[in-house]
Amino acid sequence: CQTTPVHGLTAEQIAALKSEGFTQTEDGWEFGLSDKVLFDTDEFVIHDAARQTVARIGRTLLKVGLNSVSVYGYTDSVGSDTYNEQLSARRADVVANVLVEAGMQRAAIQTIGAGKRNPVADNSTATGRAQNRRVAIVISTR
């Protein structure tokens, strides 16, 4: 007996998302990489441990038939809006490239450079700025 998908997702897909650390938001299921994929100031290089995490997530998503994602890149508040939007787009692209290496189709990955919008921490402290240099992988349920 198959259960009815919640907003288009099956119970198996939801279980896989939860097991990878995704949380449900108003936009869908989100894996926030602020504590797992932190970018250095003015950088868009993904570290090896973070690369492995993203690749594992990509393989898990594909295994349960979740073939498309949105990747949002973010920055801290230092720098101009234009520069931060470009830098955040590069961060999203780097994560998208790792998902492609894991087997996802590039055309199925939307990347968004959100700049300094939607901070998760206080930009007035070094720790807060570090947490805001992040990427989020979102599975839309709309």
Question: Can you say where each PLM-predicted feature lies in the sequence?
Answer:
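Conserved beta-strand core positions
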Residues: 29, 67-69, 109, 135
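Periplasmic peptidoglycan-binding/anchoring modules of Gram-negative envelope and division proteins
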Residues: 13-24, 38-72, 100-101, 137-142
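Bacterial Sec signal peptide processing site at the extreme N-terminus
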Residues: 1-18
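Early exported N-terminus immediately downstream of N-terminal targeting peptides
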Residues: 31-37
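Short beta-strand/turn micro-motifs at beta-sheet edges
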Residues: 19-21, 25-28, 124-126
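Periplasmic OmpA-like peptidoglycan-binding domain that tethers envelope proteins to the cell wall
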Residues: 74-142
